[in-house]
Regions:
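A short, Lys/Arg-rich alpha-helix, primarily the initiator
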Residues: 1-16
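Short alpha-helical DNA-recognition segment
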Residues: 19-37
Length: 68
């Protein structure tokens, strides 16, 4: 399922930057529990929030979706 694959990719990228879920969620103005559910593939995330995550990770949308 794409939500699970995307969530795993987001988590991998966040961890590679040494960020906790809480600190990252706060930095992109997203509720931590909502963000955690995205990483766990339990949310159908909007493109607006996907863009927030990509910007927070300082990567392009193309890079975010690579390997998804």
């Amino acid at each position: 399922m794409i939500t699970v694959r995307l969530g795993k990719r987001i988590k991998q990228l966040r961890l590679s930057k040494g960020l906790s879920q809480e600190k990252f969620a706060i930095s992109i103005d997203m509720d931590r529990t909502y963000y955690a559910s995205v990483e766990n593939g339990k949310r159908n995330i909007s493109i607006v929030n996907i863009e927030k995550i990509a910007k927070g990770l300082d990567i392009s949308l193309e890079e975010l979706f690579r390997e998804v």
